[in-house]
């Protein structure tokens, strides 16, 4: 481990001890807000303190085993103990480095998934449908709930646009690397000459706004329109203007909801999406300079960045943000087996974060 990382760990361990002292102070215990704040911080630092304590014990075991190695009768046993201790220290070192990576407060959030057909006409819409199905299948494997907010079907299948809310623990943490342009190379069903076509679809992953991180929106900045829904709800939705379209005038952001029976319910859904969009837009602008130096623009919603190519003739999927990240398992991945891909992206992100921490003063 680099000395800079070790110093950060030692500082956090000292802070953990300080918090334990503070929480034992009757004055702090009587102050509900401070007690809650310190308790939350202590809980966040506890894994680091526990792992450091285990590292200290393991180093002591290693030193004792090295002392025994000088005894001919104990040498064989000592060598075994040394090997076990060294292996455990390596594991603990890796754990401590991972614990240093700041937790993304949005990781446990639900999210909005937006998939839109890009270049490629009908084939792009079909591919957008393939991507949405891929994420839906993955969500099913994770036991997450998928709620379609709005959709515009393609003329020959798939979707020109589909927006859904995904509800489940850790949903954003797993899918936050999916934002960007996805490209497909394959022979369309309508291609009589057997030529390979290239089409594209864009994906945006937007964390749902937490009530704690809620933002204030001036009602005067909103233009609210109603229209007849074509979504769920049976014949009722076509008889009343229950669907809602909200335009945020300062930014031009437009959101719709038409899946609920009542205008009130659709308005609530649309406002949730609007808040999520505005919060994410502000966060992305603040992170632009930093993101420019990284290969993984996590959750930026940057649709202009080509992140992945799906080559059907070769059964190959390539993620362009990570060197040598090519998997020849496209049939399973497109059916929702995304974990091998997501795990590699998460590892790359952790490596980037550790490099950044190592170089920080």
UniProtKB/Swiss-Prot annotation:
The reply on keyword Protein biosynthesis is: yes
Q: InterPro entries annotated for this entry? A: PCRF (IPR005139), Pep_chain_release_fac_I (IPR000352), Pep_chain_release_fac_I_sf (IPR045853), Prokaryotic/Mito_RF (IPR050057), RF-1 (IPR004373)
Q: Which SMART domains match?
A: PCRF (SM00937)
Q: Region Disordered: list its residue ranges.
A: 284-306
Q: GO CC annotation: what is one?
A: cytoplasm
Regarding how it is modified after translation, the entry says: Methylated by PrmC. Methylation increases the termination efficiency of RF1.
Q: Name one GO molecular function term.
A: translation release factor activity, codon specific
Q: Where in the cell is it found?
A: Cytoplasm
The protein's matches in Gene3D superfamilies, at most eight in alphabetical order, are given as: 3.30.160.20, 3.30.70.1660, 6.10.140.1950
Principal location class: cytoplasm
The record's keywords, sorted A to Z, are: Cytoplasm, Methylation, Protein biosynthesis
> What is the superkingdom listed in this entry's lineage?
Bacteria
Q: Which residues form a coiled coil?
A: none
Among the Pfam families in the record, one is RF-1
- Sites where N5-methylglutamine occurs are at 235
Q: Which PANTHER family match?
A: LD18447P
- Summary of the function given for this chain in its UniProt record: Peptide chain release factor 1 directs the termination of translation in response to the peptide chain termination codons UAG and UAA.
The similarity annotation says:
Belongs to the prokaryotic/mitochondrial release factor family.
Q: What is this protein called?
A: Peptide chain release factor 1
